[in-house]
């Protein structure tokens, strides 16, 4: 894959870069695996904003993606690779030998016609899913479960992957892309390979409107607000805020650690790398 840089025929097109995607299917998605989505625009059941900067955007159907890979030892053939507006990775429509079709997160290197399978002792081949205890140390994987049978939770975004670095007893040790080292049960399933669309981080939307198409609204700086709206607000003329960066509710931000889950602290061997 390669990046396409738009010709600057207008101000909005001047900085646009996108990923060339000839291998993606150009038709409609598989209708039986679609669901309607209702937008909450960041509001809760009382109508209050609980997540800022959300609203609007293009209507989208949700693609039902199989994160559990629970059709054991039934071979499947990849019919096509598709774009999914709900995630950064591409998805693959696979046809199982028993006639069922499912969407899965497409790994890099998977193409139409490829054969994949999920099973206890599946081959170490891109797209195959099997428990971590049966995967060789050093293998690069994605779509890793956090609990056996719960479905993939780690490394699902475009271009992400996890390396299996050790197996000891009932636990496997994983090295995340962030640098974090953590243990998960060796019975958790993972898929071989890294996630597709690894050039996604090089894409430039080019204009504010492209964010609006995605349902993302503008982010106003705290120093541009009034004191009633933000701790950084107010002041005569332009100010720096006068204090260390905080959220609108006074909680320190920009590097402030908010993790509070003592139950799983023991599973983290090394915290993620910080700048």
UniProtKB/Swiss-Prot annotation:
<dbReference type="InterPro" id="IPR012340">
    <property type="entry name" value="NA-bd_OB-fold"/>
</dbReference>
<comment type="function">
    <text>One of the primary rRNA binding proteins. Required for association of the 30S and 50S subunits to form the 70S ribosome, for tRNA binding and peptide bond formation. It has been suggested to have peptidyltransferase activity; this is somewhat controversial. Makes several contacts with the 16S rRNA in the 70S ribosome.</text>
</comment>
<dbReference type="GO" id="GO:0003735">
    <property type="term" value="F:structural constituent of ribosome"/>
</dbReference>
<dbReference type="InterPro" id="IPR022669">
    <property type="entry name" value="Ribosomal_uL2_C"/>
</dbReference>
<feature type="region of interest" description="Disordered">
    <location>
        <begin position="223"/>
        <end position="260"/>
    </location>
</feature>
<dbReference type="Pfam" id="PF03947">
    <property type="entry name" value="Ribosomal_L2_C"/>
</dbReference>
<dbReference type="GO" id="GO:0002181">
    <property type="term" value="P:cytoplasmic translation"/>
</dbReference>
<dbReference type="GO" id="GO:0015934">
    <property type="term" value="C:large ribosomal subunit"/>
</dbReference>
<protein>
    <recommendedName>
        <fullName>Large ribosomal subunit protein uL2</fullName>
    </recommendedName>
</protein>
<feature type="region of interest" description="Disordered">
    <location>
        <begin position="35"/>
        <end position="55"/>
    </location>
</feature>
<keyword id="KW-0687">Ribonucleoprotein</keyword>
<dbReference type="InterPro" id="IPR022666">
    <property type="entry name" value="Ribosomal_uL2_RNA-bd_dom"/>
</dbReference>
<dbReference type="Pfam" id="PF00181">
    <property type="entry name" value="Ribosomal_L2"/>
</dbReference>
<dbReference type="InterPro" id="IPR014722">
    <property type="entry name" value="Rib_uL2_dom2"/>
</dbReference>
<keyword id="KW-0694">RNA-binding</keyword>
<dbReference type="GO" id="GO:0019843">
    <property type="term" value="F:rRNA binding"/>
</dbReference>
<keyword id="KW-0699">rRNA-binding</keyword>
<keyword id="KW-0689">Ribosomal protein</keyword>
<dbReference type="GO" id="GO:0016740">
    <property type="term" value="F:transferase activity"/>
</dbReference>
<comment type="similarity">
    <text>Belongs to the universal ribosomal protein uL2 family.</text>
</comment>
<comment type="subunit">
    <text>Part of the 50S ribosomal subunit. Forms a bridge to the 30S subunit in the 70S ribosome.</text>
</comment>
<dbReference type="InterPro" id="IPR005880">
    <property type="entry name" value="Ribosomal_uL2_bac/org-type"/>
</dbReference>
<dbReference type="InterPro" id="IPR014726">
    <property type="entry name" value="Ribosomal_uL2_dom3"/>
</dbReference>
<dbReference type="InterPro" id="IPR002171">
    <property type="entry name" value="Ribosomal_uL2"/>
</dbReference>
<dbReference type="InterPro" id="IPR008991">
    <property type="entry name" value="Translation_prot_SH3-like_sf"/>
</dbReference>
<dbReference type="InterPro" id="IPR022671">
    <property type="entry name" value="Ribosomal_uL2_CS"/>
</dbReference>
<feature type="compositionally biased region" description="Polar residues">
    <location>
        <begin position="39"/>
        <end position="49"/>
    </location>
</feature>
């Amino acid at each position: 894959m390669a990046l396409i840089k738009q010709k600057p025929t207008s101000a909005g097109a001047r900085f646009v870069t996108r990923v060339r995607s000839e291998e993606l299917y150009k038709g409609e998605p598989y209708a039986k695996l679609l669901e309607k989505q209702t937008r909450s625009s960041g509001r809760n059941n009382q109508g209050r904003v609980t997540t800022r900067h959300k609203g609007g955007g293009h209507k989208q159907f949700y693609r039902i993606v199989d994160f559990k890979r629970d059709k054991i030892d039934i071979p499947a053939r990849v019919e096509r690779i598709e774009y999914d507006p709900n995630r950064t990775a591409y998805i693959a429509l696979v046809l199982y030998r028993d006639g069922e079709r499912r969407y899965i997160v497409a790994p890099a290197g998977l193409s139409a016609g490829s054969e994949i399978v999920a099973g206890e002792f599946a081959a170490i081949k891109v797209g195959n899913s099997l428990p971590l205890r049966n995967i060789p140390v050093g293998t690069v994987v994605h779509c890793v479960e956090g609990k056996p049978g719960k479905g993939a939770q780690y490394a699902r975004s475009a271009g992400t992957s996890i390396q299996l670095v050790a197996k000891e007893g009932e636990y496997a040790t994983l090295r995340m892309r962030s640098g974090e080292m953590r243990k998960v049960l060796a019975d958790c399933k993972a898929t071989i390979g890294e996630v597709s669309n690894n050039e996604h981080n090089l894409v430039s939307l080019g204009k504010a409107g492209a964010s609006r198409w995605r349902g993302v609204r503008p982010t106003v700086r705290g120093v541009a607000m009034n004191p009633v709206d933000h701790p950084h607000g107010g002041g005569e003329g332009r100010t720096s805020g006068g204090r260390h960066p905080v959220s609108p509710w006074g909680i320190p931000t920009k590097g402030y650690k908010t993790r509070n889950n003592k139950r799983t602290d023991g599973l983290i061997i090394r915290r993620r790398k910080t700048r």
